[in-house]
């Protein structure tokens, strides 16, 4: 887990933002890229560079590949309504996202790991696919044996992140209910994710 967290810190410094809002993130003190020449600062980005950087924010925040992110965008684009809202709605309906934003796990990576190891249920059925689409009304729960894992116990005890309004978390039952599909402004991002630039990036 320490290796994963250190990798996350490096990603934050590369992007120049505290992507996950962790208090100990080195980017809070060193606002320049990692590496020997990082202290020289960030280069001024072109319009494409800004769009590409915004796309990377979402890729790293949700711990998914560029290919997956593009597929999600195309799905959002082909739906009725605003593409940006559709895009966020799909990302936030992923099982790993619901579990992470519940505050019952410390990181998006730990959420994905728990799911992959069959420690999570949706409506009392085991689901081991992090990208599984949760529907409004579904109840996601960490199985009893996994609730004793130290990082889970610590996350629940600390309650560093409060579940957003579209989720109803129950720390005693290690469960979270997905109430509704959120809009961009409701998601508790720690940084400006610039979703409009992502739409521009994929619309080129």
From Swiss-Prot:
Keyword annotations from UniProtKB, A to Z: Ribonucleoprotein, Ribosomal protein, RNA-binding, rRNA-binding
Family: Belongs to the universal ribosomal protein uS4 family.
Pfam families: Ribosomal_S4, S4
Protein known as: Small ribosomal subunit protein uS4
Keyword RNA-binding: yes
Function: One of the primary rRNA binding proteins, it binds directly to 16S rRNA where it nucleates assembly of the body of the 30S subunit. With S5 and S12 plays an important role in translational accuracy.
HAMAP family referenced in this protein's UniProt entry, alphabetically: Ribosomal_uS4_B
PANTHER family attached to this UniProt entry: 30S 40S RIBOSOMAL PROTEIN, SMALL RIBOSOMAL SUBUNIT PROTEIN US4M
A biological process from GO: ribosomal small subunit biogenesis
Biological source species: Wolbachia sp. subsp. Brugia malayi (strain TRS)
């Amino acid at each position: 887990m320490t290796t994963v967290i250190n990798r996350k810190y490096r990603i934050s410094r590369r992007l120049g933002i505290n992507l996950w809002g962790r208090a100990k993130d080195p980017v809070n003190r060193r606002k320049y890229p990692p590496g020997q020449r990082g202290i020289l600062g960030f280069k001024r980005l072109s319009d494409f560079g800004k769009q590409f950087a915004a796309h990377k924010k979402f890729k790293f925040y949700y711990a998914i590949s560029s290919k997956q992110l593009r597929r999600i965008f195309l799905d959002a684009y082909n739906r009725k309504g605003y593409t940006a809202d559709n895009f966020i709605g799909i990302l936030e309906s992923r099982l790993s996202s619901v579990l992470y934003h519940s505050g019952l796990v410390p990181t998006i990576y730990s959420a994905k790991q728990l799911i992959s190891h069959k420690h999570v249920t949706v409506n009392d059925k085991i689901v081991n696919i992090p990208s599984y689409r949760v529907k409004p009304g579904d109840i996601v729960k960490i199985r009893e044996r996994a609730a004793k894992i130290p990082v889970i116990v610590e996350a629940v005890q600390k309650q560093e992140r409060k579940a957003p309004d579209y989720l109803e978390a129950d720390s005693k039952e290690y469960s979270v209910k997905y109430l509704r599909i959120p809009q961009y402004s409701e998601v508790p991002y720690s940084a400006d994710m610039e979703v409009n630039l992502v739409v521009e990036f994929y619309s080129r």
